[in-house]
């Protein structure tokens, strides 16, 4: 049976942490509307205690968004939880997301606590959050470097308290896929009440493993993925949701999952967020880069002209991307030149392909990319020479 993966977007919270300046309420609302249109299940709208501006943004988003659950982050501090609930009180549906460091490094060096004290803080904060909603998510910060015994202990207690979602973050992007999937598998084996909660994952990209780690986690039981559009996020960024979503869609033979995502909105959503956040999309970015569906090799262009599936595993239009003409460069073959000539209105009898292609290569070597206008001029020049000879 195909199982659903919950898509939890944290572009407005974790993603914004990568920006040099805070986004205005108006810009955050625009992003939230784009995410709602995309079809994400949960929008983590912000961290309300962090600033009056963030509180106002979460409040406005909670009032306006109707088709996605709104979530706010809070530390295991009563004041944080109270403010998070206050910001979301007009939401159709909301979740309070509390987090606490669980690795020895975080417990001892950052929090200056014992693990028993961490347990007590979690218990108190879960109960506090449950005064406002029965939808509470608990994150074991730095789970990737937390001992398995400690991790399973705190997870079991949180689920006993009624926590519905347990998030396993690879906070500093430390793990590799085999290791991260083993953590998730071990949680399922060692936590007796695990069937009463959803396991979520939240991966960072410090070693370039965020997407791979997220995919490896759902293969062994995780049912919520947290990430950001374009992978924007603190340091090296978060798991890029568009990459995860397309992996699920394209590799259904291995990843037998479904989501609520409207795939045709992926490209426009990414471009909207890139523009608002003023973060350019690299040309070779998977799924949404300007080169993602371009082909310059003559062999590849010939294959594409015969059957696009030879070199494209994604139909560009399926994500809302309008296919671009083949780029004609010195690497292009005769087939690509003939195809382009036909597209701009020429018949094979209008020109000699051998002569045209020879001149095309010389021009391409000089200027790089050859345009439709260039091709027309080459034909015109060739015809003039022919007339002179005649």
From Swiss-Prot:
Domain Pyruvate carboxyltransferase: 5-267
Reaction catalysed by this enzyme: 3-methyl-2-oxobutanoate + acetyl-CoA + H2O = (2S)-2-isopropylmalate + CoA + H(+)
Alphabetic keyword roster: Amino-acid biosynthesis, Branched-chain amino acid biosynthesis, Cytoplasm, Leucine biosynthesis, Manganese, Metal-binding, Transferase
Keyword Zinc found: no
A GO MF label: 2-isopropylmalate synthase activity
UniProt cross-references to InterPro entries, sorted A to Z: 2-IPM_HCS-like (IPR050073), AIPM/Hcit_synth_CS (IPR002034), Aldolase_TIM (IPR013785), LeuA/HCS_post-cat (IPR054691), LeuA_bact_synth (IPR005671), PYR_CT (IPR000891)
Listed GO biological process terms: L-leucine biosynthetic process
Superkingdom, taxonomy of origin: Bacteria
Pathway: Amino-acid biosynthesis; L-leucine biosynthesis; L-leucine from 3-methyl-2-oxobutanoate: step 1/4
Pfam family, one: HCS_D2
GO cellular component: cytosol
Cofactor(s) for this UniProt protein: Mn(2+)
SUPFAM superfamilies the record matches: Aldolase (SSF51569)
EC number: 2.3.3.13
Subcellular location: Cytoplasm
Enzyme class: transferase
Record keyword Cell membrane present: no
Residues the record lists as binding Mn(2+): 14, 202, 204, 238
Record PANTHER family: 2-ISOPROPYLMALATE SYNTHASE 1, CHLOROPLASTIC-RELATED, HOMOCITRATE SYNTHASE-RELATED
Protein family (similarity comment): Belongs to the alpha-IPM synthase/homocitrate synthase family. LeuA type 1 subfamily.
Role according to the record: Catalyzes the condensation of the acetyl group of acetyl-CoA with 3-methyl-2-oxobutanoate (2-ketoisovalerate) to form 3-carboxy-3-hydroxy-4-methylpentanoate (2-isopropylmalate).
Subunit structure: Homodimer.
Designated name of the protein: Putative 2-isopropylmalate synthase
Source organism of the structure: Buchnera aphidicola subsp. Baizongia pistaciae (strain Bp)
